[in-house]
């Protein structure tokens, strides 16, 4: 049996990207082997601890270790993230093993997560990375993309842009495509998906500025029109979409060009408000155009997939895929025993598995980041947009900046994660080489600067208890929400609180503890008024356009921070003017500076993803792009019946 294991790195992916999320594998010194950052998975070294006689370290003990590598003991020294070049990866990006591929086999694909999956298996409705990892196997978007993230015309459809005419013409590349139930795929299924997301009763999170940019969408969404005037069907296999403005990100994977298809022959007869609970979304009747289809489901635990005989690229090379949720406590020992063939390895245990002989390792820079953000308003459902509250507790950007300077991300990245994790200077991560600004000022660890900022802004300790009061002398107490992941995460969150206290800020955990991930995001999305700031993580896909995460109408804009200046910059990034490469770079640099200055969110950690590949897997790579992909699940081949041990 072939087994794959994928670490569930982040809880959320951006609104237009459904992708596998490979977690970071981090080496660390012996004394800090069980530490891990706020969203990364942690697995205890069962065998190692038995051998060395180690017990679980308490939160206090972990906090002491963190302080030793970058807490109070270094409070006088600033560490630097700004203008730091992209480091080399620890391993190659691909591996080829000896042997002749066998025919078929069963692939066991484990999603490492502390919580069960929700079971929403529809691209248009899925909103967390666990469901999305499953959904991407049973459905495909229309377009493929190359290693520069740009759309190609090699997928289900091709696209032709007319920038001056403000249109995109989408044409299916064949008249013979079929859904997994054998029914034909036509352009009506593409149009139907656009209409579904634009429907006023749509329950998902993907209705955003990209869809509102289609001519006539506003009237359709409000119910004034029964169709979208800007969606012009040309024939059964092509459509011309008219936009209010052309955006450069239309050319990118996960960008602002709609890419989903929905089987109209199924969902047109089901009220849209009932889709999420239907058997076609929750059960075994799911229909898509991906390489697999669902055979059986154990709710929250596992999904068994079999090949889609109508998949347009041909039959899967394996006979079956079992995708199951796996506890983070067992990953390393199971890989060591040969129980899984491909594993996105946990950050905390590099020393425990780096010398394994039954696997090879490959690396990639992950398109994701950890962050801390501030709750500054609410999402107004009636208006369909984020409303910033000027009187929010965290409305002062100086207070937010001071909090950012108080955290030593490089210390945790270097000492805890042995350099495979690090701080970064920008909300645009370095993997977006074309628009990332290496010279952007970052929030380098500088507690003295944090204290000075707070002093100058009037946040002073007026009663001698070591904690600062508000400018008016009233008590300043800040509630901080974070996800429950593992003991290492709990320890790092406690260290955050110590770093905050070091600069005189009374910041406590919301409810006094971390929250289970689904509850955490439920509270954040509901704009719980008791939450002032929170730590999360984003898998951001291949389009750096900030509109979907920080736009005025973006439901994923969890901080709810909007402003005329920010809207203007986002508008320029998405404008026709930005088709000019120099202008595009200029606008993205403006955005990076603006986010830094306003500090409504700041990145904490970025890093490298390391994957273990069992030596019976013929070939595996970690490079981006689907045009010439060789490592999608349906393409993987095995060279033996049993795993190498």
Where are the regions that the model predicts?
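N-terminal lobe/hinge region of extracytoplasmic solute-binding protein
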Residues: 107-163
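Ligand/substrate-recognition segments at binding pockets and active sites
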Residues: 109, 299, 460-537, 609
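Aromatic- and charge-enriched surface segment that lines or borders ligand/interaction sites
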Residues: 157-206, 392-394
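Surface-exposed binding/hinge segments that line
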Residues: 207-269
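Gly/Pro-rich hinge or "lid" segments in bacterial periplasmic/extracellular proteins
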Residues: 255-313, 320, 447, 452
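Ligand-site clamp/hinge motif
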Residues: 280-283, 307-353, 506, 515
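Detector for C-terminal structural segments
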Residues: 309, 404-436, 488, 492-497, ...
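Append "and occasionally in soluble cytosolic enzymes with long acidic Gly/Pro-rich linkers
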Residues: 393-498
